[in-house]
Amino acid sequence: MSGTIVAKIRFENASYQTHGELPRIGSHAPDVSLVNTRLHDVSLMHWSDKRKIMYIGISVDSEASARAVIRFDEYAAGCDDIALLIVSYDLPFAHKRFGQAHDLQVAEGLSAIRHAGFGENYGVLIVDGPLAGMFSPAVLVLDENNTIVHREHLEDITAEPDYKAAFRALGIDIDE
């Protein structure tokens, strides 16, 4: 693994590290391949005509990630030009089950199971502690050209993202 340890996250009163850092605002998002709930490999080009909110989480089975996915889905409902991408190491089956169980309307579950480079390329790979190998929670907002217009790294895995800031980056006001 190349690069530096940059970000720190908290879990159960201890601090752990991630590899690298989130892509910078104004930079082009790395185009990676992920697995959707139909077991197809997809890249960011799959949503080339849409603006994107990418929520990266530990697992849809973790309380904090589940809460964030559900809230993002509620806020994104009715926004036809936005793709809500939920990325984790969960199996595609878990993403599908979660989406059905919570009647998600917009969120698209994406798994990194076939493409290990995602965590490193996006600076979210946890490198030590009990969650090593999983993704640190983060939010990236991309325009239709995949330029990053907002980023947020959650320093505590139980924290919720700033939903208003994510949608505001796309010119959308939401009520929390």
PLM segments and residue spans:
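Chalcogenol-based redox active-site neighborhoods
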Residues: M1-E176
